[in-house]
Amino acid sequence: MKVQEYIKEDGSSPYQEWFDRLDAVAAAKVTVAKSRLELGNTSNVKWFDGIGEYRIDWGPGYRIYLAEEGKQFIVLFGGGTKKSQQSDINRAQELYQEYKRRKREAIEEKEKEAENKKIKKRKKR
């Protein structure tokens, strides 16, 4: 399964920003969790409103927030701990909505480009 961080329009990655603040042991635990996701293991993920919360049963209860895109692709939105869970979920949901909007806009733009190419070909005839 392909696992990729969500990159915002400004080029930043909320997941990477969170990950970079972790200590070495926590970063190792999160890396193992990400590897499990890449292997398709979502048994530690609780799903709600399109967002998945991967629970790491260690330390302060680390979480990774994600969404599935089809059956072979996972998008990472960020992370947090049990203590900040509700605000982390809210942030992940905002990022997920932004992701879906940008994806929809990209599809619409490609469709417009394809239609414009067809029109130009017809005009050349």
Short names for language-model regions:
Residues 1-61, 70-74, 81-125:
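Basic, Lys/Arg-enriched alpha-helical interface segments
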